[in-house]
A protein has these predicted regions:
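Non-transmembrane "mature" sequence context
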Residues: 1-146
């Protein structure tokens, strides 16, 4: 199983795979309410390049539990589905702002001035945290760094 996106086109394939579920907040919420299979989890690992343990930590689920879900083809709960879909949107924006995954993930691991010195990856455990990071990316995109 691949764990990392090797080419930019592969990243955009993953992003476009979920594009019909992330068009707006209403569509995303309705998709999340249904839950998605654990393939979404694997796609987020591939897209982000982060380890299974890190991504599982965002969902507050152990890697072992997620492996069992994958074996049983279970669906993720609505909150986990929503968070992972928002992370896909976040990476779409991050790739646009930073140009590639390497620079974006490097930024995610360092204190962000616009977030009061918080390290972005540390607040990706909540939907609100992902929203704050997305807002910060918008400010960076438009040059509003103050």
């Amino acid at each position: 199983m691949k764990n990392k996106v090797s080419e930019p086109s592969e990243a955009y394939q993953i992003i476009s795979k979920y594009g019909n579920m992330t068009g707006n907040d209403q569509v995303l919420t309705l998709a999340a309410m249904k839950g998605l299979k654990t393939g979404l989890f694997s796609d987020v690992i591939s897209l982000t390049g982060f380890s299974r343990d890190i991504v599982a930590g965002w969902l507050d689920i152990s890697s072992k539990t997620l492996m069992n879900y994958e074996k049983q083809s279970k669906y993720l709960n609505p909150a986990s589905t929503e968070l992972l879909l928002k992370i896909i949107l976040l990476f779409e924006k991050g790739l646009k702002v930073f140009g590639d995954r390497i620079h974006f993930t490097r930024w995610l691991k360092k204190p962000a001035y616009g977030l009061g010195g918080v390290i972005p990856i540390e607040i990706m455990r909540t939907s609100g945290g992902v929203d704050l990071i997305s807002d910060e990316l918008t400010r960076i995109e438009y040059g509003d760094l103050a």
